Amino acid sequence: MEIKILHLVEGAKNAKGLTVVIDVFRAFSLAAYAFGAGAKKILPVADVDTALMLKEKNPHYLVVGEKKKQKVPGFDFGNSPSHILKADLTDKTIVHTTSAGTRGLVSAMHADEIITGSFVNASAIIEYIKMKKPPLVSLVCMGYAASIPVEEDTFCAD
């Protein structure tokens, strides 16, 4: 099994094989907690306009995320796991957009399969990779705003 560690949006664009897009502190920790709170589905999108358009077409969807570290007006929740810890998300569909993590998911067009990575789901990722035994794994560290590498994402990949 070959493992490549890539960085930022350019890394996501070059990712192949089983791809783990890593955004430790916010996006994918929030995603893990959202599923833990009963969310049925998370739809990652690259930008605020797409998120709001999906909400307009599907008023029962919840919109979660941030732009420049701030909750966007009209969104149901920001991008911190603490924003959803007490929320009942049972059977909810969440539209999620962030400055880093969801942009990586959308950019990983050449991946065979894409999963999200964070410390909160690291053991599940390891078990999944062991089970799948892919010939190539790409670990994509999304960094701060998908433009500056950060230690926590790199540590998670290591």
Task: Please identify what each model-predicted range represents.
Residues 4-14:
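A short acidic-Thr-Gly-centered motif at the start of a beta-strand
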Residues 11-12, 19-31:
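Short acidic, Gly/Ser-rich segments with clustered Asp/Glu that frequently serve as metal-coordination loops
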Residues 16-17, 91:
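A glycine-biased structural micro-motif
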Residues 18-20, 62, 138:
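Conserved beta-strand elements of the Class I
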Residues 37-42:
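Domain-level signal for Mg2+-assisted phosphodiester chemistry and nucleotide/NA-binding surfaces
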Residues 43-132:
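Acidic/Gly/His-enriched mid-domain segments of enzyme catalytic cores or analogous surface patches
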Residues 136-158:
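Active-site rim beta-loop-alpha module in soluble metabolic enzymes
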